[in-house]
């Protein structure tokens, strides 16, 4: 008798579980699909269009899988909860998560990608950032909140940093382009109170490792010192993991110095202020009263050179969507996603055509940190081809050949350069892995 009751209970439980799976599956198909992730600050995978060609030649099943997982009901809440849980138990540094950093310096084996010859060292006076008060903060889901500022702790993986430099070296050899690299530190390098220094990796050491691993023909744009020098200014957001437009400008100045170009004066730009801005780290901690009480202002420096910009899909095909590089406040008045005011967000591929006549065309390989930086390049190039390596899956060699690209620039932030999942994406984008 007991066995029959047990069997009936098991059957009822199985039926209930199956019904829940069917209901959730049905909801995930028929509910309205989101198109943007506020937590991750990115566009979500669009619904793929079926065709025989797509099925056999364009990885249609993979696109369906990505679309389904990206638009699953409650995904945003689940991602936020996962971030919080990871923060409670600590996360290793060979991965990247919004607001979750490593608490140790990983000593990994070297990568198999070829390492370049160390570059010659230059002697320069040491630059130090202003002294940071050694005040107490609060850990929230892997993010350290100090007063009204959220700090994303940094995980230093030597293995992945070396891998990043190897990818750049291989790219330059493959395409024969004059190649530059600009990797920026984050605010935790300059704003972390002394009592928490052991909880975050040394970003300057990581940047020096990149420099030492790059081939001698690679132009390494060293921006650590200028970011340290200006760290007392508003060069990083308090509620977001990105630099501000001003921070990106100072990096642009260093790029110009390294290339023999004259940077446009900061005061020559018209500005648009988007406020209030509460960014990725504010969302990662689930909201914080002190941060909310003193929100960021996102300042856009308006492009001065006449231009057109077209955004393209992941494979780089189609006619492109014409948009703007400098969005006005009224365009985003009712939007929380004000970071897209820089270069209209993170399209997989964008082509900017200016009215310059320099004969120079540049390919920029970046993630979201490059959005605030790229518009400054319009002063110096006829065309700027911008690839977000996280999303683009087209033929980058075809773009280089058909556009007549003359040089390339990698613009990345140190957390992305040291994250294996991001390096996987970069290699896939370059067609070096599946």
Language-model segments: residues:
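Extracellular glycan-modifying ectodomains
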Residues: 1-434
